[in-house]
Structure formats: structure tokens, C-alpha cells
């Protein structure tokens, strides 16, 4: 008898440490320019996280602090040239404000790492997953990433894998302010690929909550 095709969901919390710091400050993690780094060290210190809006300027997720400072300077030189003024009228760490007002200087928040707080958030989010699936069907890959065997739950909830992923992630967003990307696949490898290579490149939906990509085994065959 042919074995039933299984469905796995991989969930990754976007720029997790940076998103937690934004959530703690009541800021939007998708539009706030923020890095998590210990500024008491040298400029060569590695940022533990970079917010999505700063990454959009070409700053990598594990940049050194001096790379962030250099890129911000470059961006501000370009902004000043466009307005043809020597001085900015103000500054902002929010991309929406910066887009609306070219005369504002780009700034960013440097948040000191708080590992105990990030672990606390991770535990809270894991408990949210437990509202939908049993612990034996959740594999914790890292502090910000899990794999879920959703096979048995799709019929129970009368949902597609995409709908179940959306429900869980929107719950996480509402309860914690943290956004995520999800990948769906017929095995762990495919859902990981769907999330890492495809879903993370898609802009969050209208709720700012989730992007999804679904890969099946036959779709990857030559």
C-alpha cells in the first residue's frame, strides 16, 4: 500500500533578535532600522541581527558594526545629494517616514543583545504552536526556527497547509509582534528549501505576517 504523502511546515521568525527588540520598543520590526550589537566593543563587533529594512540597503544579517555605519553614511550622502542641501531637517529610524520625507537623515537603533529575553520570546512562541499541534510533531531546529509535521492536522482542522501555517503565524504576530516566513513541503528538506530560498524573498502579506512557498517532491525532480 502506498504511504500517504506527508506535509511539513517550516517556520522561521524574521530577523528574530532584531524583531524582539522592536517589539519591546513598540516599533514595527519590518520598517524600523535596527541592529542588535554590543556597541561597547570595537566597530569590528558582529551584529547578531539586522532588521529587514536595513537589510534592504544591502547590509548582510551578520554584518560588522563598521559595515553598518559605512553603509548608513553612504545612504545619507545619496539622500543629501538628492535634496541638494547641506543639512537634513531631522532624522528617523523608520523607513516609512524616510520614504515620505527625503529631508530626513537615515538613522538606526543599536540594541544591546539580551539573550535571556530572546529565549523568553522563543518559549512563548513555542507555546503558541502547541495550541495547534502536539509537541511530538514539533522539531525545534533553533531559537527562531521549527519544523512541524502537519499531516495529521489538516483534516482535523479542515485546512490546507497554507491556511494552518497562516493561522499559527498570525497568532504569533498578534501575541508577540514577531513576523515570520513559512515553507511547506512533502519532507523536511523540501520545506526547509521552500522557506530559505523562496519564501524569505517574498514580501509579507497584507497583515505583515507571513509568506509561504509549497514544494512537493515531484516538483524538484529533473
Describe the function of each predicted region.
Residues 1-216:
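Gly/Gly-Pro- and Ser/Thr-rich, intrinsically disordered tail segments characteristic of DNA damage-repair
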Residues 217-222:
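A short, hydrophobic C-terminal helix/tail in secreted or cell-surface proteins
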Amino acid at each position: 500500500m502506498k504511504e500517504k504523502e506527508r506535509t511539513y511546515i517550516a517556520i522561521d521568525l524574521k530577523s528574530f533578535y532584531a524583531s524582539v527588540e522592536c517589539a519591546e520598543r513598540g516599533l514595527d520590526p519590518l520598517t524600523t532600522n535596527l541592529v542588535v550589537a554590543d556597541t561597547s566593543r570595537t566597530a569590528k563587533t558582529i551584529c547578531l541581527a539586522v532588521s529587514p529594512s536595513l537589510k534592504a540597503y544591502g547590509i548582510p544579517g551578520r554584518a560588522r558594526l563598521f559595515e553598518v555605519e559605512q553603509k548608513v553614511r553612504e545612504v545619507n550622502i545619496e539622500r543629501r545629494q538628492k535634496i541638494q542641501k547641506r543639512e537634513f531637517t531631522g532624522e528617523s529610524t523608520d523607513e516609512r517616514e524616510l520614504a515620505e520625507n527625503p529631508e530626513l537623515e537615515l538613522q538606526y537603533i543599536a540594541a544591546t543583545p539580551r539573550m535571556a529575553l530572546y529565549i523568553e520570546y522563543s518559549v512563548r512562541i513555542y507555546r503558541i504552536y502547541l495550541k495547534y499541534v502536539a509537541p511530538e510533531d514539533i522539531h525545534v531546529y533553533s531559537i527562531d526556527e521549527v519544523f512541524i509535521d502537519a499531516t495529521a492536522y489538516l483534516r482535523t482542522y479542515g485546512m490546507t497547509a497554507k491556511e494552518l501555517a497562516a493561522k499559527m503565524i498570525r497568532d504569533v504576530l498578534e501575541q508577540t509582534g514577531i513576523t515570520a516566513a513559512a515553507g511547506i513541503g512533502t519532507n523536511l528538506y523540501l520545506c526547509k528549501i521552500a522557506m530559505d530560498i523562496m519564501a524569505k524573498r517574498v514580501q509579507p502579506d497584507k497583515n505583515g505576517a507571513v509568506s509561504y512557498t509549497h514544494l512537493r517532491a515531484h516538483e524538484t525532480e529533473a
